[in-house]
């Protein structure tokens, strides 16, 4: 049974409802005086006990403690690792912002530098301290349902529960002058705030939980507008079921979480209404002021507060630029490329009137501030061995959508990814780590916002490895020349950084942007310089490798695409105060959605499974003709395989290199087979509004002839009898890695050390078959017969079945010999037919 969509969110908010505490009734001493002397004595005794219960004075409580003034004053006993936090009466009931980052990870399950988001808050969580007697409640206030102050329904909205994150008891007496009270903040901060224990509970063979007795406060710093708190959390298990290669002892590890508590931004920032035709991250709430509105949601674009210093000029510097700091962990040799990737976005801002909207600064080696400090937006290098990825979250004001902090983290291993084996050929432990990573990501998807998920870097590194080996196969005996290597890596880093910076500027993915250029345009230097390789850096763009003998353009996006300029214009263009209303001006910008170069689709349009209906809304595709593009890529794979013995089999080198190169030749198959299969039963989906210039209908079936072309491509290049052919000599040279490593991969989980070639091919062939025989796709094919124009013969389910049957069983029909790959394929085909007949859901 499918859970309602709201259930995961309800589970993650930690919704403990605070009991309503009613004030005690006031006693009228004249009318309700004690009736007896004994009763009077009881009252006197109670008064005396109350005086004694006040405890030590404020000064006595913090005697010997180091005072650290700031937003929330801290008192610290370094020897005892004891901390008091002071709250003034004015701070009770006020909403603050709490940003949480993991600044130290274990390197296997979780990395360092991660931004932690909780529930509906995303990455900028509102918090509030409420006092009830001598108890302080640490709350996540419910700001997601609102109404105007003078609306009667406001009272009902305010009765919706907040979430309680922790509680603490007041220590000693208030400060005699400020009225501030002291509390031990350990129960508030020294807790499993990231719900690591919950994540592990959903995984097999992993059983770590927090040990509060071994957890403690780390570094504490304070500033007038923000308080920074580090907590060291220890996770332990008495029975580790797997060896963690990044730990000296798998029975325990420590994470450091950094809390950055700050005031809400105080500015004249104006929220900007979002539009579904352009892809931005959103801050949203439901407004109950009027029940007549057709949609209760109010959606704001997430964006930085950017204003012209000189509004009268067409182009002006901003009052306050967006500043990114390059953390001192970034290798020196990559810093220029990282800087270039950040500053790429200034081109888009200049078109709408901002000069140098973005500024890049270098963190000094001796800097005394931490990148987790909410005052600094950073780009950081972090270590998680064997993983190649990058993410770019930002933090926003939950009331307005104003972005006030962003921290991009990039895996140090992503450059080395080209030297790894392809995923299907990786050692069992490496595959297991990938599976664990996928399980963690899936579980965290229940806790956070799936729209903020980004796996671009992992796939980009696979693309980079494929391109790297192809270019080395085409080069002379010495491989790529050093300048070519540096140019390749520079372009790669620029695109990766520009993509993640785009996220921190508020832009979502655009998985249609890669479809706007022809083959000639992809490799035309002028087009590359003017419009980039694709329509947006926010797509998952593959490496742009030209077919053998064809002129070569840029390998990666080193310039913004046409969509990027449009998305920045919508979010940041200063609006004319004297012109049309804001809504009309924004609608005019968004109404360009039907222009071919502005085509847009995002994560919810690009599901990998059969929920994804649009063959243009895919990852790792390129060119206006995807089928032709993948046909070229398969020819490039054949080229790589044919040249690999000559180019990579060098005297004195190890045979493991050949196995690695052989594996990367499968990359076009793993990325392309599923994408081409989407044309079969596909529907182009558009977000145009009624009345847009050249507007399109929401759904347009893929032409039947195009579906037949896609199926023909699959049957020839993936399912056909001549699809996969290698010499025995080559297969016998594909040696596995025999060096010892931290994972004992040459022992643990090893079943076969030779290359499982039939399994590799079958894995590729299963991709289209799994899609073609999925009940949802078959139902869609049936429905599509009603969607085609009367003058077009539709592509039908019967045609799909007949084409696959005649292709897969051609030898049996003709009485010809059947090779081993085809026998495997025929067994797989029978399995799908059996499933349809015997176990098809009602």
Summary of predicted features, one role per range:
Residues 1-11:
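Bacterial N-terminal signal peptides that target proteins for export
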Residues 9-19:
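Bacterial N-terminal signal peptides
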Residues 21-24:
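Sec/Tat signal peptide C-region and signal peptidase I cleavage site
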Residues 27-330, 348, 352, 357, ...:
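Auxiliary tRNA-acceptor-end handling modules of aminoacyl-tRNA synthetases
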Residues 330-334, 479-497:
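Short pre-active-site segment immediately N-terminal to the catalytic Zn-binding motif
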Residues 343-354, 384, 502-503, 507, ...:
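Sec-exported extracytoplasmic/periplasmic mature domains
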Residues 362-383, 491-547:
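The catalytic-center signature of Zn2+-dependent metalloproteases
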Residues 476, 483-488, 513-842:
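Conserved catalytic/binding loops enriched for acidic/polar residues
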